[in-house]
């Protein structure tokens, strides 16, 4: 299981990945090849993030497809579009993504405060119109590591939520080999699969589900 978080700027991007199985920390900065190598080695694992269903997974997939991550970032954050609409190519990158964020959550920083932890904010503005300095990259890496560590803490507090999702995945597989890609789906989606629900046209909309009568 890997925990990950991306930070994206106009001319720089970085990701911190903490591999809980191998107890390793990966820090990748502006290196598409290194990211691809890590993905190829770990694509069958579960990747865990905070709000990763709506953001980080699409940054990861986009970089692997050769897109500029800032374009994807702005498509999602600035224009308010769902990440899956950016390009159909993103669907060709399988990822067992699990998002610890729930619908009513107020954000990772809110969790940090509610858990009694220090809230860390980066001093580097995300709209900076130049390459980051070495000092700014170091500060952003430190901030990103902190966010991943907080994501791990949220996951541990919500372990039962994950276990419940995993049980639904097992039921959805109906005795066949475990398909971990299903871990990305919401509980209603998994319940629909278990109940043999069907979609009315596959538009790629994760909330468009038709339950059987």
Regions from the language model: what does each represent?
Residues 4, 15-17, 97-100, 112, ...:
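Generic structural hydrophobic/aromatic packing signal, biased to beta-strands
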Residues 1-79:
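Conserved RNase H-like, two-metal-ion catalytic cores of nucleic-acid enzymes
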Residues 34-37, 59, 107-110, 139, ...:
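Exposed alpha-helical structural elements
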Residues 117-122, 130-213:
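Conserved "right-hand" nucleotidyltransferase catalytic core of DNA-directed polymerases
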Residues 47, 52, 57, 69-149:
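Active-site-proximal helix-loop-helix substrate-binding element of RNase H-like nuclease domains
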């Amino acid at each position: 299981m890997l925990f990950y978080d991306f930070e994206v700027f106009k001319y720089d991007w970085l990701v911190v990945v903490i591999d809980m199985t191998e107890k390793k920390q990966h820090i990748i900065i502006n290196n598409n090849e290194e990211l691809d190598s890590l993905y190829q080695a770990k694509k069958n694992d579960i990747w865990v993030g905070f709000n990763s269903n709506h953001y980080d997974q699409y940054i990861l997939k986009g970089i692997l497809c050769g897109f500029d991550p800032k374009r994807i970032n702005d498509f999602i954050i600035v224009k308010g579009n769902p990440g899956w609409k950016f390009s159909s190519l993103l669907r060709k990158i399988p990822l067992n993504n699990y998002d610890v964020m729930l619908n009513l959550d107020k954000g990772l920083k809110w969790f940090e405060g509610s858990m009694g932890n220090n809230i860390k904010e980066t001093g580097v503005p995300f709209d900076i119109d130049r390459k980051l300095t070495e000092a700014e990259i170091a500060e952003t890496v430190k901030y990103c590591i902190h966010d991943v560590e907080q994501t791990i803490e949220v996951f541990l507090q919500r372990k039962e939520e994950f276990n419940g999702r995993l049980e639904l995945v097992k039921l959805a597989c109906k005795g066949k080999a475990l398909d971990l890609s299903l871990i990305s789906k919401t509980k209603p989606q998994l319940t629909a699969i278990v109940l043999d629900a069907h979609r009315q046209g596959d538009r790629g909309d994760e909330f468009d589900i038709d339950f059987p009568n």
